[in-house]
Design a protein with these regions (language model features):
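Short, well-structured N-terminal submotif of metal-dependent ribonuclease cores
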Residues: 1-40, 55-60, 121, 130-137
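Acidic, PIN/NYN-like endoribonuclease modules and their adjacent C-terminal/linker elements
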Residues: 2, 72, 105-137
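Acidic active-site catalytic centers that drive phospho-/nucleotidyl reactions
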Residues: 6, 96, 115
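Alpha-helix capping/helix-boundary segments
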Residues: 9-10, 44, 83, 99, ...
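PIN-domain endoribonuclease scaffold, especially VapC-family toxins
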Residues: 25-92, 97, 101
Length: 137
């Protein structure tokens, strides 16, 4: 499977948010075991850099973390002009709409997020990490 992963999955891990972090970690392990491909939008890395730097207050540590996470386990995909413009025409949150169009333009099978309600009736398959784990058992 080709999975576009929302920033909230990585934020759960970074901030060690209890059960959400555990499930997110199991999700990442399972993608590796099943040879699924994790895609992440370049804008997600930008967002993560902001949160990490705000926490660690160190550019090098921030960059090292991003390299270790995104450089090793993810394929980074860009945002096209068409994705950016199309997302503006949709109702709802721009960043969520941008993920939808990025998912479609990169032929991903699903978006993985903990906020499924943000993607209702958007025309893409959306899974929580738990749902992915159930599918892959």
């Amino acid at each position: 499977m080709r999975l576009l992963v929302d920033a909230n999955i990585f934020l759960d891990l970074f901030y060690n948010r209890g059960e959400l972090a555990e499930i997110s970690n199991q999700f990442l392990d399972a993608t590796y075991d099943h040879k699924d491909v994790i895609y992440v939008a370049a804008t997600t890395i930008k967002d993560m850099a902001y949160f990490i730097k705000r926490t660690v207050h160190d550019d090098k540590k921030t960059n090292d973390y991003l390299i270790n996470v995104y450089g090793k386990i993810c394929k980074i995909v860009g945002i096209t002009d068409d994705d950016a413009i199309s997302a503006l025409y949709e109702d709802g949150d721009y960043e969520d709409n941008l993920l939808v169009f990025t998912c479609q333009s990169n032929m991903c099978d699903a978006i993985v997020t903990n906020n499924k309600k943000h993607f209702i009736n958007k025309g893409v398959c959306v899974l929580t990490p738990n749902e992915y784990l159930k599918i892959r058992k």
